[in-house]
Regions:
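Histidine-rich, glycine-flanked metal-binding segment
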Residues: 1-4, 9-56
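Residues that line or immediately flank small-molecule/substrate-binding pockets and catalytic motifs
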Residues: 12, 61, 94
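Divalent-metal coordination cores built from histidine and acidic residues
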Residues: 79-147
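Short, glycine/charged-enriched secondary-structure capping and boundary segments
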Residues: 19, 38, 71-75, 104-107, ...
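Active-site-proximal flexible loops/turns
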Residues: 14, 19, 66-70, 132
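Active-site beta-alpha loop architecture of Rossmann-like, nucleotide-cofactor-dependent enzymes
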Residues: 11, 65, 127
Length: 147
């Protein structure tokens, strides 16, 4: 599928791009910027006048409260809110119930996050039960997917 996003304010610090231009997308990948008249007939068009187009944002400190406090927020509602705000990746804190201090809890969270609209990362607690007495097995936590 071809898509042209018209007149978006493209802001990309990595490339130094900061301009209002068209964005050309094919099969969900950006393939170019500017005018491509040969595409105009075949491409779906999206008017982005007045909108900013930027790389996805990353929030390195979120509290989705899942597991344990899902009446406040859960992986689904938190990820949808993050996506609506332009975030494509979030890093969840470990102060849940149970506390994220075992590989099994990490694996459970990451498994449930697989089909969400954003990338969900999970940090590990430093000590078991947040008690500051015994360290978690950091290698096991990393092997389970903790960041």
């Amino acid at each position: 599928m071809k898509l042209v996003i018209k007149n978006g304010h493209v802001m990309d610090p990595a490339s130094g791009r900061d301009e209002v231009t068209d964005i050309w997308v094919e099969d969900k990948r950006i393939i170019g910027f500017g005018e491509h008249p040969e595409w105009e007939e075949d491409a779906e068009k999206l008017n982005a006048d007045g909108c900013i187009a930027a790389p996805g944002l990353v929030d390195v400190h979120v509290h989705f409260r899942d597991p344990g406090f899902t009446y406040k927020e859960d992986l689904e509602t938190g990820s949808r809110a993050a996506a609506a705000g332009g975030f494509t990746t979030v890093v969840c804190m470990a102060n849940t119930k149970p506390i994220v201090d075992t590989p099994e809890v990490i694996q459970d969270i990451l498994k449930r996050a697989e089909n969400l609209p954003i990338h969900v990362k999970q940090v590990s607690a430093v000590s078991k039960g947040f008690e500051g007495k015994e360290l978690v097995d950091f290698q096991a936590m990393v092997d389970a997917g903790a960041c």
